[in-house]
Curated annotation (Swiss-Prot):
Acts as a chaperone. This is Chaperone protein DnaK. PANTHER family: HEAT SHOCK PROTEIN 70KDA (PTHR19375). It comes from Pseudomonas savastanoi pv. phaseolicola (strain 1448A / Race 6). One of its GO terms (molecular function) is ATP-dependent protein folding chaperone. Coiled coil: none annotated. Residues 616-625 have a biased composition (Basic and acidic residues).
Amino acid sequence: MDRIIGIDLGTTNSCVSILENGNVKVIENAEGTRTTPSIIAYANDGEILVGQSAKRQAVTNPHNTLYAVKRLIGRKFEEDVVQKDIQMVPYKIVKADNGDAWVEVNGQKMAPPQISAEILKKMKKTAEDYLGEAVTEAVITVPAYFNDSQRQATKDAGRIAGLDVKRIINEPTAAALAYGMDKAKGDHTVIVYDLGGGTFDVSVIEIAEVDGEHQFEVLATNGDTFLGGEDFDIRLIDYFVDEFKKESGMNLKGDPLAMQRLKEAAEKAKIELSSSTQTEVNLPYITADATGPKHLVVKISRSKLESLVEDLVQRTIAPCEMALKDAGIDRSKINDVILVGGQTRMPLVQKLVTEFFGKEARKDVNPDEAVAMGAAIQGAVLAGDVKDVLLLDVSPLTLGIETMGGVMTALIEKNTTIPTKKSQVFSTADDNQNAVTIHVLQGERKQAGQNKSLGKFDLAEIPPAPRGVPQIEVTFDIDANGILHVGAKDKATGKQQSIVIKANSGLSEEEIQQMVRDAEVNSEEDRKFEELASARNQGDALVHSTRKMIADAGDKVTAEEKTAVEAALVALEAAIKGDDKAAIEAKVEELSKVSAPIAQKMYAEQAENPEAAAKPAEENGKADDVVDAEFEEVKDHK
């Protein structure tokens, strides 16, 4: 079986991992870092930048630089959280034909799974470069509190990226896997508190030894899919904007370039305040008016930051209480608290978690890498490389259908262990009713309209009968990915209808296939771009070496030879400026051909007069005592 990689597709950063020789390895990307910013940029020349390269140019290209797109995945445009996001991001969030939230770049509408696929492609290539072989299968993580639409959309993103997604696994569960694999035998209960860039999850997980097998059972999960580090950044940005307005009377919110610089400064300040008690944000030439350029200089203390975000941190406590209640466990019975997600590095978050659970969180789990590592372990379990692990996850939200009076009737309660299957018999509401509409819902409210609508389908041709007589059996089947399959059957006729829930949200099969084709075209374009760059580099090197050879040859070169070489050099330099790889290669060959006689002449002369050839080397000998300095790149630790 092929290698199955583990990918943490994060809101702010993403990470890829593999199980190798029994050990989990987090793979460094081409830039040498173990995490990759989940940022995608579309350059004017059509090039797609992903990760650090996209982040670097964000200030000069804010409208076409997309970040935190995971917050939009599987969501409707009209949702309050999406409307709130529209006010905060410099790129354009638009309404798709099916009502979903999409983004628009350079006049082209794109679905969030299509954009997330670019990050997954980067993770896939990172793994392939390390392993030296093609990678086609992956386990991808999602927030535990993701609903069905969001899980389906994540799976679609994997397909568009050319990956067969073997399993969708919840992020806290993955972190528990990474933590629990090497722990001593015996039963213990852990809390995974996962506050990432865009989402918050908390899970109560029991790790037990059953017949020599590590069993990870999720007892309960809760969370908020629109609460994370991005919200903390927004509070800081708002503070900086207000301070600047007080000082200069100018509002920066209408200036996308200024807002992008502020976003980067806010993120940097937030990170610095986790280890320092004060920092200064200094952004020269942030804007200008008739009197000249304006500069933003703001000092901010850790206590000020904490006062700005205290309510956000407090919002994580209610889900913790609910998860403990659903699990039927007192907080005193928790053995370990595991912090996951970059935002948990904030001292205020750590303090609140310690106070709530009555114990310090463990420090031996890397909050940025644990999720990807757990995904890699699950991949190894599915591949058969790890045999002593059993993972029992849960469905995070109640699933049911709309019944008479606009009531939601539950079929599968929240925190039910998955995979699971449940059937229930319903009947008609009117006499001689010949069809029923099955409206599938997800959520905790009794009123159907207050829950998330996952889809509708009809069961028709029911034989005429008084109301309440026909027996319609509705079956809900949740697979190991947490994705729902629904069926309805008329028990009298045996007629049935079923769907995988993605009907009223998400991408159609045709759209996914088109995006897969587009991704393949992009891969081909990337390959061509690399080949063109290689040809240009080869041409540049030849131009440089030929000019040096002509200069060294001096009067040994005839006027005719010099003219021919100069013409070939000019032709090659012109070709290098163009985009035609074949033309560059042809001009390289032409220059090599006309300069070959000169090279042969120089070589023959050196062979006849070795002393003369050695003389320049002797003159340069004095430099041999110079020692090359060794420089080490210092990376910012986040």
